[in-house]
């Protein structure tokens, strides 16, 4: 039988408290950056701009997809976060989508070849608004995951990530000064099914 004295228990508790305090550098001039979830100003805009879902068939997740709408409101938050993290203006990071409707889409699928959104023989990508559906003018694979996963929580080593741009004006779908909420829908479809993401 093990006997614990109050002194031993107090020493053990104190050692745990001291050890848990060493989770970041104590050196002067060194600081860690907030992750996406800790940057409350950015995270709120990110959450409002991001939609996602799973395409499930016969109890199997075939695709897990998320899209972040590069609305003017979110784009401003992205630029501010980039200035905090990288101490530079990355306003031109997604220059292709600066005045157009653009999305960052992350997709995971069991087969690597099946998640190539730029392959129009396998995927149909549409932007639906009150003017009707349009196909993208740009589907560009993002390769710099190390940089962009600091901005998009759904990016991982297992996802394929794309910048998708449509020839439509970008709007803030939740802006309070709008008389009528604009229809903003991204549709991703292939032979297995489709997913519609609404803002």
Predicted regions and their residues:
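C-terminal motif of bacterial Sec signal peptides marking the signal peptidase cleavage site
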Residues: 18-21
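Bacterial N-terminal signal peptides that target proteins for export
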Residues: 1-10
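Conserved functional micro-motifs across diverse proteins
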Residues: 23-199
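Hydrophobic helical h-region of N-terminal Sec-dependent signal peptides
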Residues: 10-16
């Amino acid at each position: 039988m093990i006997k614990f004295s109050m002194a031993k228990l107090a020493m053990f508790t104190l050692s745990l408290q001291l050890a848990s305090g060493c989770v970041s550098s104590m050196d002067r001039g060194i600081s860690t950056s907030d992750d996406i979830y800790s940057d409350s100003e950015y995270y709120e805009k990110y959450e409002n701009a991001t939609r996602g879902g799973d395409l499930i068939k016969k109890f199997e997740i075939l695709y897990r997809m998320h899209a972040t709408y590069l609305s003017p409101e979110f784009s401003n938050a992205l630029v501010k976060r980039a200035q905090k993290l990288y101490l530079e203006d990355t306003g031109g990071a997604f220059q292709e989508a600066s005045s157009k409707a653009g999305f960052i889409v992350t997709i995971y699928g069991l087969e690597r070849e099946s998640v190539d959104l730029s392959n129009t023989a396998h995927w149909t990508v549409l932007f639906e608004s009150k003017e009707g559906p349009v196909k993208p003018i740009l589907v560009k694979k993002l390769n710099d995951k190390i940089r962009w996963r600091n901005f998009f929580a759904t990016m991982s080593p297992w996802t394929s990530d794309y910048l998708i741009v449509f020839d439509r004006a970008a709007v803030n779908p939740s802006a309070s000064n709008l008389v009528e909420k604009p229809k903003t829908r991204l549709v991703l479809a292939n032979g297995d099914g489709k997913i519609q993401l609404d803002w």
